[in-house]
C-alpha cells in the first residue's frame, strides 16, 4: 500500500482541518465564495441537502465534470460524496483526485447491508455517526474523519446536538471502564472492542469528529464547537441563506472564535434571513436521512 494510504497519514490529513468550516458547493462560483470566506475545504455535489430532500428520488454521486470544475477553481481541499456501499462511485472519485470521500447518508444508499471497506483506498474517507457504536464501526472500516449525521437539509441543529452529546457521553463512559466491562460494552454498542480499547487509551476518538446536519447560523456553529466538535460542515445553510457571502464569513469566524460571544453577536447582525428550517419532528421515518447506514 502507498504511504499515503496508511491510517496515520490519512488521519493526519483530517487533523489539518481542525477548527475550520467545510462548505457544500454545487459549482465553481460557490467554491470560490467558500474559499474567499475562509473555508478549510469544500464538498462538491450536484445539489445541497435541502434540494435533495425537496426533490426526492434517487440522489447519486455528482457529475465528475462538476467535481473537476470545483477542483480547478480553488486551492483548498475538495471533498465529494459517494453513496453508502457504492464501491465504484468511491473508486471514480479517487480516480478524479479528490482529497476526501464522504460515504454519505445524504445520498441514496446503494447497499443496505455493507459500507465501503475504506482501507482499500489511498484517499481518506469521512463518515457520519449518531453514536459511539456507529463511530467505532466506521473507524474499524477505515474512516479517517467523522461527523455527526444531524438531520441534513433541515436548518435545524437539534439532531446534530443530540448526536454530538451522545458520542461524547459514551466516550466518557468507555474511558472509565475496566477491561471486562469494555468487552461487554463493545457487544452492547455493536462496536469492535479494539476500537474501544484505543478510545479508552486516548481518552477520545482516534479521528477528528466534526459537526454536521442542520447548522444554519454563526451561533449554531459556535454551539457545536462548544459541545466539543473539532470543526463544522455546513451544507444548505450557506447557499440557501439570503446572503451567502456574509453567512459564509460569519460562520467561519464564529467557528474559530466560538467563545467570543461579543464577536458572535457582531457577526450575527445584518446577515439577512437564514435558510428556512424544517421541524425534524414533522418528518416521516422514511424522510429522516440520519437513519441511513448502520
Swiss-Prot record:
Catalytic activity: aldehydo-D-ribose 5-phosphate + D-glyceraldehyde 3-phosphate + L-glutamine = pyridoxal 5'-phosphate + L-glutamate + phosphate + 3 H2O + H(+)
Keyword Lyase: yes
Positions annotated to bind D-glyceraldehyde 3-phosphate: 165
The enzyme's E.C. designation: 4.3.3.6
Active site, UniProt feature: 81
GO molecular function ontology, one term from the record: pyridoxal 5'-phosphate synthase (glutamine hydrolysing) activity
Keywords: Lyase, Pyridoxal phosphate, Schiff base
Keyword Transmembrane helix among UniProt keywords: no
SUPFAM superfamilies linked: Ribulose-phoshate binding barrel
HAMAP family: PdxS (MF_01824)
Subunit and interaction comment: In the presence of PdxT, forms a dodecamer of heterodimers.
Name under which the protein is recorded: Pyridoxal 5'-phosphate synthase subunit PdxS
Organism: Geobacillus sp. (strain WCH70)
Amino acid at each position: 500500500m502507498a504511504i499515503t494510504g496508511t491510517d496515520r497519514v490519512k488521519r493526519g490529513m483530517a487533523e489539518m482541518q481542525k477548527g475550520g468550516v467545510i462548505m457544500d458547493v454545487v459549482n465553481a462560483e460557490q467554491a470560490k465564495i467558500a474559499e474567499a470566506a475562509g473555508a478549510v475545504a469544500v464538498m462538491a455535489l450536484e445539489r445541497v441537502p435541502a434540494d435533495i430532500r425537496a426533490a426526492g428520488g434517487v440522489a447519486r454521486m455528482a457529475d465528475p465534470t462538476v467535481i473537476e470544475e470545483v477542483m480547478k477553481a480553488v486551492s483548498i481541499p475538495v471533498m465529494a460524496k459517494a453513496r453508502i456501499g457504492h464501491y465504484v462511485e468511491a473508486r471514480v472519485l479517487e480516480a478524479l483526485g479528490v482529497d476526501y470521500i464522504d460515504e454519505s447518508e445524504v445520498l441514496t444508499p446503494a447497499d443496505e447491508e455493507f459500507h465501503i471497506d475504506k482501507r482499500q483506498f489511498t484517499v481518506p474517507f469521512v463518515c457520519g455517526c449518531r453514536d459511539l457504536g456507529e463511530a467505532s464501526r466506521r473507524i474499524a472500516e477505515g474512516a479517517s474523519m467523522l461527523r455527526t449525521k444531524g438531520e441534513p437539509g433541515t436548518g435545524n441543529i437539534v439532531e446534530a446536538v443530540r448526536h454530538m452529546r451522545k458520542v461524547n457521553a459514551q466516550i466518557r463512559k468507555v474511558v472509565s471502564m475496566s477491561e471486562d466491562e469494555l468487552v461487554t460494552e463493545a457487544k452492547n454498542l455493536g462496536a469492535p472492542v479494539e476500537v474501544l480499547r484505543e478510545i479508552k487509551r486516548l481518552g477520545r476518538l482516534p479521528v477528528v469528529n466534526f459537526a454536521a446536519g442542520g447548522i444554519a447560523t454563526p451561533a449554531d456553529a459556535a454551539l457545536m464547537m462548544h459541545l466539543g466538535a473539532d470543526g463544522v460542515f455546513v451544507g444548505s445553510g450557506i447557499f440557501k441563506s439570503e446572503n451567502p457571502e456574509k453567512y459564509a464569513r460569519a460562520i467561519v469566524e464564529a467557528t474559530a472564535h466560538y467563545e467570543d460571544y461579543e464577536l458572535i453577536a457582531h457577526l450575527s447582525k445584518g446577515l439577512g434571513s437564514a435558510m428556512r428550517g424544517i421541524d425534524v419532528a414533522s418528518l416521516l421515518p422514511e424522510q429522516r436521512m440520519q437513519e441511513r447506514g448502520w
